[in-house]
Amino acid sequence: MLKQYIGIIDKDENSDYGIMFPDFLGCVSVGSTIEALKIMAKKALEFHIEGMIADGEEIPEPSKFPDVIDKYGEKNDFLVIGIEVEEKINL
């Protein structure tokens, strides 16, 4: 199932672009350009989710955009990353 997770972009004047995902504490990435950031952010998120699945952790539902805006403010830049997440089926 494709899930869309919101990343919050950070960029200081003399730094690369950084991104963090509010739904996954500790999942961060960087890129020297926005295009590089998109690639690296998707890889980081996939790796983070794979680790959670391997550890038997539940994958959170994506936050809703208005909730992220309320928490982190409108002045931030955001990036939405689509990730295929396998659903757990309990038999």
Where is each model-derived feature located?
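Short, charged, surface-exposed hinge/linker loops at domain edges
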Residues: M1-Y5, K42-L91
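Structural detector for hydrophobic anchor residues on beta-strands
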Residues: Y5, Y17, C27-S29
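Short aromatic-glycine-(Arg/Gly/Cys) micro-motifs in beta-strand/loop hairpins
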Residues: I9-P22
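Residues that cap or initiate secondary-structure elements
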Residues: E13, L25, E87-I89
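Residue-level detection of beta-strand scaffold positions
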Residues: I19-F21, V28, L45
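A short, exposed loop/beta-hairpin motif centered on an aromatic-Gly-Thr core
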Residues: L25-E35
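Compact nucleic-acid interaction/catalytic patches
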Residues: V30, K38, E46
